[in-house]
């Protein structure tokens, strides 16, 4: 969740009926009553579900982190069952935007669903699941 121009925004992972992964954004003025705002999608189908999205800005760049399910493995990339990575967002995620190629946070096997927060001294801390059961 983040606040922009006096409005609170919340981003959630989604899967369409056509098995296309995306994120959805809701807005609220009071953090109690939420209404649908918009969808965030890649230009082409990218996985069937975007879990645990996290949107934040760091050093002038905008990040949309997500654990994407349903990626087909390549020779050395996307071979894990559980992917955790991010898109760089160009433009306004609430309006006109484009997403970069998906980049992995980690090339190991056990880092999933990362979320981040900003500390009082301005550092961004990211935490995620480790030791997946599969």
PLM features per residue range, with description:
Residues 1-134:
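Carbohydrate-active catalytic/glycan-binding domains of CAZyme proteins
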């Amino acid at each position: 969740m983040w606040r922009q121009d006096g409005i609170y925004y919340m981003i959630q992972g989604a899967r369409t009926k056509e098995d296309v992964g995306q994120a959805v954004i809701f807005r609220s003025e009071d953090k109690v009553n939420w209404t649908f705002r918009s969808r965030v999608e890649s230009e082409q189908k990218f996985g069937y579900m975007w879990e645990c999205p996290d949107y934040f800005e760091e050093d002038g760049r905008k990040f949309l982190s997500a654990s994407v399910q349903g990626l087909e493995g390549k020779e050395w990339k996307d071979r894990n069952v559980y992917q955790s990575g991010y898109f760089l967002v160009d433009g306004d995620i609430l309006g006109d935007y484009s997403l970069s190629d998906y980049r992995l946070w980690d090339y190991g096997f056990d880092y999933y669903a990362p979320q981040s927060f900003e500390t009082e001294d301005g550092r961004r801390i990211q935490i995620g699941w480790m030791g997946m059961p599969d």
